Amino acid sequence: MSEQLSPQAQNRGVTLSPSVEIRIENLYKSFGSHHVLDGINLEVHRGEMIAIVGGSGSGKTTLLRHIIGLDQPDRGRVLLADHESEGSLLVDLATLDAVGMARLQRHWAVVFQGNALLLGQTVGYNIALPLREVQGLDESTIHSKQYEVVREVALDPDKDLDLTIDQLSGGMAKRVAIARALALDPILLLYDEPTTGLDPQIADQIQDLIGSVHQRTTSSGLARTSLLITHDKDMLYRLEPRIIMLDSGRILFDGTYETFRHSNSPVIQPYFELMPKLHQRLEGSVDPAAQQAPS
């Protein structure tokens, strides 16, 4: 017999769903007369990698802000998996108080476009801060975590933990932002334009790192779910995620990378205008010496 929720639980916005990490139901959001999100319905399953793409003003960032609870919808619901409950529960974010939201937030992390690192502070301090303030870990555990996650993003903990953020290259700063997110051992990892502003070779390295991080399970053995907000066509080619394309706040496409790539839609086709150059670079037709960029 399948589990049944009580009417009280249903009224609190709780629903059963064993494999779903995010469910968005009939989501609307307007700013003035501008409809930014216009009836979004989306389900993200545990372990998926999803890229949300679209032009400027399509609603990508607003959708991300709703998923992490920074914005409230005009209509509709955003439900996220509650990994601290018994069973497979999805909880409506709008029903949560601060304590309930904090409980959910322990299991996700966001890598922001601007990295959100504290300038003037060291790499080690930036990684330790959420471990100390949010998770309340002791200093010995924090020290071990710092070394572990810095190695995971291909930095040298003996050299790089003591560097200040203003001493880092763009690629190193992005690696530190990813390391800080990994330190929280997230089941859901969200990236907002993770390669914006990076040189092409460095962007390639960050894309490969994102793919590698996605393949690693959490400490509890759960598959990691990755959600990317991006306009980076190269990333789609390298990672081949499930693709959600937004246009004027609506989902224009939801499907595999291969279907997206071969679409004849006049809206989708421009995303592949630069693909031949990328293919040449990946196949080695560019001078290899030109690709030896520092990380």
State the predicted function of each range.
Residues 185:
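Conserved catalytic motifs of ABC-family nucleotide-binding domains
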Residues 204-221:
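Helical segment within the ABC ATPase nucleotide-binding domain
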Residues 68:
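Helix-to-loop junction immediately C-terminal to a conserved catalytic motif
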Residues 77-103:
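ABC ATPase NBD Q-loop/coupling interface
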Residues 164-168, 172:
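Conserved ABC ATPase signature
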Residues 189-192:
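Catalytic Walker B motif of ABC-type/P-loop ATPase nucleotide-binding domains
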Residues 140-159:
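Conserved ABC ATPase "signature" region
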